[in-house]
């Protein structure tokens, strides 16, 4: 959706990724605070006031955190034509995408998913939102990113549990569509296979962008779970 997956940044190194984030000294970045510690070479050239780090925890997906993003965007005079770069896993992608979608009726959103689950699922398809009154994703909308840039080296610092979560989601897609390459749960897939699975979800979401028909097949296993 949007301009879709950006293959030119598949398997890119941190220097290339950093230069992408440093399109200018006006770049606006919202990122997982853990990534700031794990990949210090990616972020330093951006003026600190134009980076907002947030903890990647489910309790972050709240109105309070969303207001914090609004304040950050407002204080940096972000306009609808500005790119907002979001770097993180599902929590950060969900929350920041919702804030970007609703700030001034929507700015240009560029996602850099940092977990396997986000690369093949959370960052793809445009769903975004936050938790409310204890209900997960109770407030949300559809807002496809202009670009989704997959930096596969992020996977090198994932915990085994994070890999399992991602491969479990990929296995669900494989059960839905057996033309996809076979994967082995718990093993880190090759970058080309990650891209293949992300494209599969994008095809479904492009055909049914607002989850009214075909896209519901992606809920396979979720309701039972």
Enumerate the predicted regions with their spans.
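Active-site segments that bind and position negatively charged phosphate/pyrophosphate groups
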Residues: 184-225
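Residue-level signal for inorganic ion chemistry
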Residues: 29, 62, 113, 151, ...
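Structural motif
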Residues: 86-87, 112
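Glycine-rich beta-strand-to-loop/alpha-helix junction loops that act as flexible
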Residues: 56-57, 87-89, 220-221
């Amino acid at each position: 959706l949007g301009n879709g997956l950006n293959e030119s940044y598949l398997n890119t190194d941190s220097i290339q990724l950093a230069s992408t984030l440093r399109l200018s000294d006006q770049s606006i970045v919202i990122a997982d605070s853990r990534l700031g510690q794990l990949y210090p070479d990616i972020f330093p050239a951006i003026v600190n006031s134009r980076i907002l780090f947030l903890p990647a925890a489910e309790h972050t997906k709240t109105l309070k955190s969303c207001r914090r993003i609004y304040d950050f965007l407002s204080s940096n005079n972000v306009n609808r034509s500005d790119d907002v770069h979001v770097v993180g896993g599902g929590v950060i992608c969900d929350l920041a995408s919702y804030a970007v979608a609703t700030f001034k009726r929507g700015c240009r959103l560029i996602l850099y998913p940092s977990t396997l689950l986000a690369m093949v699922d959370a960052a793809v398809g445009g769903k975004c939102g936050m938790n409310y009154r204890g209900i997960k994703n109770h407030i949300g909308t559809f807002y496809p990113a202009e670009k989704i840039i997959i930096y596969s080296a992020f996977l090198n610092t994932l915990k085994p549990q994070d890999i399992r979560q991602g491969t479990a989601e990929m296995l669900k897609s494989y059960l839905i569509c057996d033309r996809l390459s076979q994967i082995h749960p718990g093993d880190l897939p090759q970058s080309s296979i990650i891209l293949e699975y992300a494209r599969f979800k994008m095809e479904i979401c492009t055909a049914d962008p607002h989850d009214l028909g075909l896209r519901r097949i992606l809920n396979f296993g979720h309701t039972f779970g």
